[in-house]
Swiss-Prot record:
Keywords: Hydrolase, Iron, Metal-binding. One of its GO terms (molecular function) is GTP cyclohydrolase IV activity. This is GTP cyclohydrolase MptA. The keyword NADP does not apply. It comes from Methanococcus maripaludis (strain C6 / ATCC BAA-1332).
Length: 315
C-alpha cells in the first residue's frame, strides 16, 4: 500500500511560512584544527527552511537527517575546521533535501572549554564559554544558492555600576568633610580605597560575518568580549584571587552601554582586514543584582558604518 505524501498536499489556509524546522537538536561533532588535536563539541542545532503557500508542510524528518549525514559523512570526507563552515555544509544539504525551499538557515550553539589560570595564585581551571555559528542561504530565481555565514561567541564577565559608585563616593566625601578632613586628605583617602557599588554578571555576545576567503578566529572574539567588561570571572578563586577580581572590577566600572561600545571598538581594531560590508552583531546583557530586570544594549551594523562612526569621533 502506497502512502500519500500529506506534506505535499495543499493547505487549507494558503499562506507561506518564513521558517519551519527543528530546534534543540544535539549532535556530537568533531572538528579539525591546524597542528592541534581535533576538537570535540556537543552543539545544539536549529535548522529551518521556508515553506511556500501551496504546500501543507515541510518533510520534517529531512532536517535532522541532513545534520546526521553532514556530521557522519561529510566531516569524514572533508577537512572542516570551523563551526561556520559546518553550518554552510548543512545549509547546502537542506536545499538538496527540501527542493521546494528558497531560504534555509541554521543556528549552532555549543559550550567551549577554555584552560585558564586564576589571576593571583595561578591555579588551573576550566572555564566555559559558548561558541555560535549561523549560516543563511537564499536560492535565486535561476536556482543559484547564495550563502552567508557568521561566527561568534558568548562570554560571561563581571560589571560594576559607575552610577552607584559615584553616589557612594559623594557620600564618602560629605562624611569625611563633616569629620574635619581637608580636601587634600580626602583625595588621598579616596585614592587609597576601593569605592563600593553593585555588580552584575555580564553576558557579552559578538557575531561576525565570515566573507569567502577570510577567517575570523573565535579566540579573538572571546578575548574581545572578556576585555570589554569590568573584569573576568573564574570558576576557581582563592582568597587573594577573589580580592583581585572584585577590586579590578570596581576600579573599572562600566554601564551596559560602555561594554557594547567597547566591544564595537575592539572588533573594528582587531578585524581591520575584513571587507567594509561585513556584518557585525554586538550584544551585552547585564544581570542586575539590585533589580529584578536585566540591562540590555545591542548594535547590528556593518564594519563600514562602525569604522565611519569611530573615524568621525577621532577627527
Amino acid at each position: 500500500m502506497q502512502c500519500n505524501d500529506v506534506q505535499a498536499t495543499e493547505p487549507d489556509i494558503k499562506v507561506s511560512l518564513t521558517r519551519v524546522g527543528v530546534t534543540n537538536l544535539k549532535k556530537l561533532v568533531k572538528l579539525k584544527r591546524t597542528n592541534k588535536r581535533d576538537i570535540v563539541l556537543l552543539p545544539t542545532f536549529e535548522v529551518f527552511v521556508d515553506l511556500p503557500s501551496s504546500q501543507k508542510g515541510i518533510h520534517m524528518s529531512r532536517s535532522p537527517e541532513v545534520i546526521e549525514e553532514v556530521v557522519e559523512n561529510i566531516l569524514l570526507e572533508k577537512e572542516i575546521y570551523g563551526v561556520e563552515d559546518l553550518s554552510v555544509e548543512i545549509v547546502m544539504k537542506l536545499f538538496e533535501k527540501h527542493e521546494y525551499a528558497t531560504r534555509a538557515e541554521i543556528m549552532l550553539y555549543s559550550d567551549y572549554m577554555m584552560e585558564e589560570k586564576s589571576p593571583v595564585t595561578q591555579k588551573d581551571s576550566q572555564e566555559i564559554g559558548k561558541i555560535i555559528a549561523r549560516a543563511y542561504g537564499v536560492k535565486d530565481e535561476n536556482g543559484k544558492i547564495h550563502v552567508k555565514k557568521m561566527v561568534g561567541a558568548e562570554v560571561v564577565g563581571i560589571t560594576a555600576c559607575p552610577c552607584a559608585q559615584n553616589m557612594l563616593k559623594e557620600n564618602a566625601v560629605t562624611s569625611l568633610k563633616e569629620k574635619g578632613f581637608s580636601n587634600e586628605e580626602i583625595e588621598k583617602i579616596l585614592d587609597s580605597v576601593t569605592i563600593a557599588t553593585h555588580n552584575q554578571r555580564g553576558i557579552g555576545t559578538v557575531m561576525i560575518e565570515v566573507p569567502n576567503g577570510y577567517t575570523v578566529g573565535i579566540s579573538k572574539i572571546i578575548k574581545i568580549i572578556k576585555d570589554s567588561m569590568s573584569g573576568e570571572v573564574y570558576e576557581l578563586l582563592k582568597r587573594s584571587d577573589e580580592a583581585f577580581v572584585v577590586e579590578t572590577a570596581h576600579k573599572n566600572p562600566k554601564f551596559v552601554e560602555d561594554c557594547a561600545r567597547e566591544m564595537i571598538k575592539r572588533v573594528v581594531d582587531v578585524f581591520d582586514y575584513l571587507p567594509e560590508d561585513t556584518q557585525v552583531l554586538v550584544r551585552q546583557v547585564n544581570k542586575e543584582s539590585i533589580h529584578r530586570h536585566d540591562a540590555f544594549a545591542e548594535r547590528n551594523s556593518t564594519l563600514r558604518e562602525l569604522r565611519d562612526e569611530l573615524k568621525t569621533l577621532t577627527n
